[in-house]
């Protein structure tokens, strides 16, 4: 009886626990779902990235975007990763009621608020990543309330002020990343108490001005220490010998001085990367730096180091990148460096090295770049160099190399850049037909003899060719005119004969001088005088015969043309011309481009099968410019090389459509950046953009031949690369599509606010008009306001940005009200006012009152020199 009772009791107890846990699990699951929905409700989600977050029995919340669940023992939310979803709004603490949440990643979004202290309620949270947002304000003392955190990443925001001492109370912290912010002051001693720290990143905080604190040497678990591009000065602490776990040390781009501690190298046996470049360090090469045999990257460049490189560097069997350029190193360059099995990059420019490049360089099978300009290397360039099939850059100008180039010099299938100018090389230039990817070849200032190899014409991507100051003879090969040469310099040789016409028309005369036997248009010798005897000796009969033959051929071709045209009257032809080695088919292009787009100008992003991204600009050629003329005009513009001008990589055309193919820029247009996230562009970046655009405009209108005007400058035609370097686009389109089509394009796609007043009645485009458009772009940079956003005046009239600004600055303290309040600070207000004055001068109604581009550049450079760089 007792046994039966016990059995019934056990069953009852089990059922009780079952129903209890079932109810608990059901309650917890519903609670989790509700917390997540409240968390989502606080966001602005313009792309609908979280549209799948809704209450439905068909989709468990553990399967929602960004949600990861863990069994503990049943399924619970443990991680939320909403990286790069264009989210904004407020960060709610409703997720702190998720009892097992350990990981929260909201990086690469647009959250615009102070550091959310309310998340300190998340008592189980171990990782908090808010990097690459618009987080602003200081790090509060209450940061210590995040007691469970192991990872803090607030990098790439607008966090300012001093690093609080209370940060040192987070004893569990393993990763602290505060890089790319606006922090000031010193690194507090409390950071030295974070004994579990593995990663410390305080880089790119230019106002963090102090010596590197010695207490950092106590962090013996530290594997990454990143202090680059900040305001650190003084010496490298000797206490760093205590960082025995360190793998990456980056102190570059600071103001450090003194020597590298002698015991540092032997102590850091786990070191993989050491970068102390661009400081003011001195002394000798750090001894024992390869004692751990793990070093991959060694960057000592742009300092004041001297002495020789020790042969012990041969112990660096893992070394891939050696950068020691721009120092005072001397002595023989270690032979062992040339045969390291993993070495990829050797940069030793601007030192006083001697020695030779040995035949054993062939053992460096991974070698990609050699840059040893301005040293005292000697001997012959070895046959072994041609056996390195990975080599794509060999730059060794201003040395003492002698002898002939080996026949296999250009056998690397990826070789793109060769500069061996200003040496003592001699003999004939070898056949370089294997260098199919050669873009730049400079052999200037040597003693080469013989003729220019005709095979150079087979190098279809060759863009720069400098053969000046040699002893070359013979004719300039006709085939060279088929290349897209941005530079062709054969001055001071012994060349003779007629210069191919297209080469003469696109070259400065100085690139041909010093060849008295050359003749052609614009040269001292006219080739027609050489044929005078032909006319004197009865060549008229031959001329008449040739004319008759030409007429017969022309008649035949005309008949053939009319016949063929009838057959293909309705058949369109696809044509293309590329200046860089990539493949693009009509199918790939038309897959991206909708042919029913309205006339005007559109930009598409095209992804090739290789993964490379291209920008494609669609234009309408309403004038039906001939194929020959179109090619000539695009080639003229494609030859332009300037760091602030977008490269044209090629073009395609079909019927009345033209597609210009540009290099892709990662950060889009200035217009989009200002509209979307203007406060991500601090003043130093905006000033860099202004100066770059002005320099690009001046280059195309004054330095480049033929002189060009932009005629369509606006913020939407200024693109930004990954470093926010401006790239000018869409200039001189009138040369490509013709004036009529260009005017239609401008009227359809450009707001008149960018257009100079005289453009409405003047028949001639001028530099003053470009200056006016540039002034409007300057106003956008200074005010943060889109030029296309008109306001209504007191009388009901529409005011463009120029009129708006001019009216506002007439009010009391109006100039200060005009400046972009999102980035305005005491440190930049004066410079922003100066730039505003330049913008107002550029947008003067009377063209003659506007400054020249040269003057604008000088004024902007004067402002730029006083601005401290701040990372965007």
Curated annotation (Swiss-Prot):
Membrane topology of the entry: Single-pass type I membrane protein
Single GO MF annotation: protein kinase activity
Residue(s) carrying Phosphothreonine: 585
Residue(s) carrying Phosphotyrosine: 662, 699, 754, 761
Residue stretches of each LRR repeat: 79-98, 99-122, 123-146, 147-169, 171-193, 195-217, 219-243, 244-267, 269-292, 294-316, 317-340, 341-365, 367-389, 391-412, 413-435, 436-459, 460-482, 484-506
Transmembrane segments: 541-561
Ranges per topology, Extracellular: 27-540
Keywords noted in UniProt: ATP-binding, Glycoprotein, Leucine-rich repeat, Membrane, Nucleotide-binding, Phosphoprotein, Receptor, Repeat, Signal, Transferase, Transmembrane, Transmembrane helix
UniProt-annotated binding residues for ATP: 595-603, 617
Pfam families on file: LRR_1, LRRNT_2, PK_Tyr_Ser-Thr
One CC-aspect GO term: membrane
Cytoplasmic side: 562-872
InterPro entries to which the protein is assigned, alphabetical: Kinase-like_dom_sf (IPR011009), Leu-rich_rpt (IPR001611), Leu-rich_rpt_typical-subtyp (IPR003591), LRR_dom_sf (IPR032675), LRR_N_plant-typ (IPR013210), Plant_LRR-RLKs (IPR050647), Prot_kinase_dom (IPR000719), Ser-Thr/Tyr_kinase_cat_dom (IPR001245)
Signal peptide range: 1-26
Residues carrying covalently attached carbohydrate according to the record: 55, 63, 86, 129, 255, 297, 374, 419, 489
Localisation per UniProt entry: Membrane
Domain Protein kinase: 589-863
Family: Belongs to the protein kinase superfamily. Ser/Thr protein kinase family.
Record remark: domains: The protein kinase domain is predicted to be catalytically inactive. Lacks the conserved Asp active site at position 712, which is replaced by an Asn residue.
Protein name in UniProt: Probably inactive leucine-rich repeat receptor-like protein kinase At5g06940
């Amino acid at each position: 009886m007792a046994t039966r009772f016990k059995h019934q009791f056990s069953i009852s107890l089990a059922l009780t626990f079952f129903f209890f846990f079932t109810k608990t699990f059901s309650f917890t699951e519903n609670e989790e779902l509700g917390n997540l929905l409240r968390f989502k409700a606080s966001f602005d989600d313009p792309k609908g990235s979280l549209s799948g977050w809704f209450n439905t029995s068909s989709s468990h919340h553990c399967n929602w975007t960004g949600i990861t669940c863990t069994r503990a023992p049943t399924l619970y939310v443990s991680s939320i990763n909403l990286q790069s979803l264009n989210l904004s709004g407020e960060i709610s603490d409703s997720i702190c009621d998720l009892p097992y949440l350990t990981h929260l990643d909201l990086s690469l979004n647009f959250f615009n608020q102070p550091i959310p202290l309310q998340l300190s309620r998340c008592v189980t949270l171990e990782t908090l990543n808010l990097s690459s947002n618009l987080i602003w304000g200081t790090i509060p003392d209450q940061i210590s309330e995040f007691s469970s955190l192991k990872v803090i990443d607030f990098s790439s925001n607008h966090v300012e002020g001093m690093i609080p001492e209370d940060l040192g109370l987070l004893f569990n912290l393993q990763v602290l990343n505060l890089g790319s912010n606006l922090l000031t002051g010193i690194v507090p001693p409390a950071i030295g108490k974070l004994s579990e720290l593995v990663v410390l990143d305080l880089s790119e905080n230019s106002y963090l001005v102090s010596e590197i604190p010695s207490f950092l040497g106590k962090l013996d678990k530290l594997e990454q220490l990143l202090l680059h591009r900040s305001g650190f000065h003084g010496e490298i602490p000797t206490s760093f010998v205590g960082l025995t776990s360190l793998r990456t040390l980056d102190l570059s781009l600071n103001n450090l001085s003194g020597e590298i501690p002698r015991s540092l190298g032997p102590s850091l046996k786990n070191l993989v990367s050491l970068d102390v470049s661009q400081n003011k360090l001195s002394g000798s090469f750090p001894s024992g730096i390869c004692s751990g045999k793990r070093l991959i990257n060694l960057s000592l460049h742009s300092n004041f180091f001297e002495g020789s490189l020790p042969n012990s560097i041969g112990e660096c069997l893992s070394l891939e990148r050696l950068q020691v350029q721009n120092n005072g190193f001397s002595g023989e360059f270690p032979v062992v460096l040339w045969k390291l099995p993993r070495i990829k990059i050797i940069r030793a420019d601007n030192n006083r090295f001697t020695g030779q490049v040995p035949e054993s360089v062939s053992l460096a099978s991974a070698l990609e770049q050699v840059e040893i300009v301005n040293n005292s290397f000697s001997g012959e360039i070895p046959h072994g160099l041609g056996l390195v099939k990975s080599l794509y850059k060999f730059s060794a100008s201003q040395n003492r190399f002698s002898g002939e180039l080996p026949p296999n010099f250009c056998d690397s299938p990826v070789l793109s850049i060769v500069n061996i100018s200003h040496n003592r090389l001699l003999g004939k230039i070898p056949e370089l037909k294997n260098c199919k990817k050669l873009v730049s070849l400079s052999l200037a200032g040597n003693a080469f003899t013989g003729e220019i190899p005709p095979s150079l014409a087979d190098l279809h991507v060759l863009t720069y060719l400098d053969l000046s100051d040699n002893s070359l003879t013979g004719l300039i090969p006709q085939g060279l005119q088929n290349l897209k040469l941005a530079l062709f310099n054969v001055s001071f040789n012994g060349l003779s004969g007629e210069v191919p016409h297209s080469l003469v028309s696109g070259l400065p005369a100085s690139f041909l001088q010093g060849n008295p036997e050359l003749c052609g248009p614009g040269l001292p010798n006219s080739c027609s005088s050489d044929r005078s005897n032909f006319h004197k000796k009865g060549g008229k009969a031959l001329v008449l015969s040739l004319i008759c033959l030409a007429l017969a051929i022309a008649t035949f071709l005309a008949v053939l043309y009319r016949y063929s045209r009838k057959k293909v009257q309705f058949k369109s032809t696809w044509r293309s011309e590329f200046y860089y080695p990539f493949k693009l088919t009509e199918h790939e292009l038309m897959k991206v481009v909708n042919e029913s787009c309205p006339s005007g100008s559109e930009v598409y992003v095209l992804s090739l099968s290789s993964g490379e991204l291209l920008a494609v600009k669609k234009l309408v050629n309403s004038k039906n410019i001939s194929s020959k003329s179109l090619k000539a005009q695009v080639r003229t513009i494609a030859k332009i090389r300037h760091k602030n001008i977008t490269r044209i990589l090629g073009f395609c055309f079909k019927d009345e459509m033209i597609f210009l193919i540009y290099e892709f820029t990662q950060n889009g247009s200035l217009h989009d950046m200002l509209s979307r996230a203007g406060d991500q562009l601090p003043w130093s970046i905006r000033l860099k953009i202004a100066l770059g655009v002005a320099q690009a405009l001046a280059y195309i209108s004054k330095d480049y031949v033929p002189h060009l005007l932009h005629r369509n400058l606006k913020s939407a035609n200024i693109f930004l690369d990954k470093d926010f370097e401006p790239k000018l686009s869409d200039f001189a389109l009138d040369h490509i599509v013709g004036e009529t089509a260009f005017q239609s394009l401008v009227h359809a796609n450009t707001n008149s606010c960018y257009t100079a007043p005289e453009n409405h009645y003047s028949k001639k485009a001028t530099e003053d008009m470009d200056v006016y458009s540039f002034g409007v772009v300057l106003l956008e940079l200074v005010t943060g306001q889109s030029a296309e956003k008109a306001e209504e005046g007191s009388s009901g009239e529409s005011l463009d940005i120029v009129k708006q600004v001019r009216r506002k600055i007439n009010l009391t303290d109006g100039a200060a009200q005009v400046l972009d309040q999102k980035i305005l600070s005491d440190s930049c207000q004066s410079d922003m006012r100066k730039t505003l004055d330049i913008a107002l001068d550029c947008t003067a109604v009377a063209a003659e009152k506007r400054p020249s581009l040269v003057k604008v550049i000088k004024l902007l450079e004067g402002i730029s020199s006083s601005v401290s760089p701040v990372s965007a």
